């Protein structure tokens, strides 16, 4: 039985959540249409289309899923298709799509953060910092040929799994998060250091030229 339930939730796609009364475990179920999930995977692994942050999350979901019931074998077939090497074209496209929005184009996130700091707009600083980090991690995981695990424990996942990490990765990330919480001008310096170290790594790996780093 459930001690509390929230059913037929429409907010982040159809889903149900409840607390399992005997254990207190929170059960979280999200429903995906089979055709929709297929389209997401083919868009990624066949067509190699990048997104702005979180590009390979559904691929990661598929790869790490445990099949409990699959009477037609549909999910197993899709999972077998997904168990492939990281496509190099996809890797390059994720980086080339997400890297410029960090600070390489006029409306880049770093520039939006600078303007928000000047306005004293703490909500906007928080919002734009989150967007910057979404693309930052998309670039980092693509560089390492890792599927993106989603929004939780990203730093821990990177530290455990990324063979290639920017210099001062953990310190830079913590500095950005701490400074952005107060919308201090220090956030601009922290973002610059974070992105400088990412660009140094990308340049060393031959992924971008020096002229692309700013």
Regions flagged by a language model, labelled:
Residues 1-2, 132:
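Extended hydrophobic/aromatic-rich secondary-structure runs
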Residues 73-214:
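Conserved nucleotidyltransferase catalytic core and NTase-mimicking acidic/glycine-rich helix/loop elements
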């Amino acid at each position: 039985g459930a001690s509390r339930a929230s059913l037929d939730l429409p907010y982040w796609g159809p889903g149900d959540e409840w607390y399992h009364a005997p254990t207190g475990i929170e059960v979280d179920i999200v429903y995906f249409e089979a055709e929709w999930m297929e389209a997401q995977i083919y868009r990624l692994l066949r067509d190699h289309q990048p997104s702005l942050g979180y590009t390979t999350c559904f691929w990661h979901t598929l790869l790490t899923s445990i099949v409990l019931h699959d009477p037609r074998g549909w999910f197993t077939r899709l999972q077998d298709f997904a168990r492939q090497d990281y496509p190099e074209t996809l890797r390059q496209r994720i980086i080339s799509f997400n890297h410029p929005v960090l600070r390489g184009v006029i409306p880049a996130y770093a520039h939006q953060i600078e303007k928000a700091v000047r306005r004293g707009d703490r909500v906007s600083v928080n919002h734009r910092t989150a967007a910057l980090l979404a693309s930052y991690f998309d670039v980092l995981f693509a560089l390492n040929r890792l599927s993106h695990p989603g929004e939780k424990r990203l730093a821990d996942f990177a530290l455990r799994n990324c063979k290639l990490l920017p210099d001062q990765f953990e310190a830079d990330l913590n500095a950005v998060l701490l400074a952005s919480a107060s919308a201090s001008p220090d956030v601009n310096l922290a973002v610059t250091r974070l992105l400088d170290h990412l660009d140094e790594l990308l340049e060393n790996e031959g992924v971008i030229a020096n002229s692309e780093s700013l």
